[in-house]
UniProtKB/Swiss-Prot annotation:
Residues 5-54 form a coiled coil. GO terms for biological process: synaptic vesicle lumen acidification. It holds the Pfam family V-ATPase_G. This is V-type proton ATPase subunit G 3. The keyword Nucleotide-binding does not apply. It comes from Homo sapiens. The gene is ATP6V1G3. Signal peptide: none annotated.
Length: 118
């Protein structure tokens, strides 16, 4: 019977060692998963910062070009207004004279379709 109890005792010890090894492997696996998760988070943060930097750079280029465009449009508008004011001042006198002469200087004429009934 002692040999049987020794065999059972050896089996229990082997089972305990296997259980300890499994627990140790689970702990190592958990530690590796935690480390991998931390590394992934660091990598994600770095990637996010890189993409944010690229986005801000592109945004500043676009916004800068929009500011340049708005300044250019403002300059063109002011130039056009000055040009129109110049034309107004230049031609105002002659246009008013033509308009007044058309209204005031009437030349009475008989219409071409008028027929004398006499």
């Amino acid at each position: 019977m002692t040999s049987q109890s020794q065999g059972i005792h050896q089996l229990l010890q082997a089972e305990k060692r296997a259980k300890d090894k499994l627990e140790e492997a689970k702990k190592r696996k958990g530690k590796r998963l935690k480390q991998a998760k931390e590394e992934a988070m660091v990598e994600i943060d770095q990637y996010r910062m890189q993409r944010d930097k690229e986005f801000r750079l592109k945004q500043s280029k676009i916004m800068g070009s929009q500011n340049n465009l708005s300044d250019e449009i403002e300059e063109q508008t002011l130039g056009k207004i000055q040009e129109l004011n110049g034309h107004y001042n230049k031609y105002m006198e002659s246009v008013m004279n033509q308009l007044l002469s058309m209204v005031c200087d009437m030349k009475p004429e008989i219409h071409v379709n008028y027929r004398a009934t006499n």
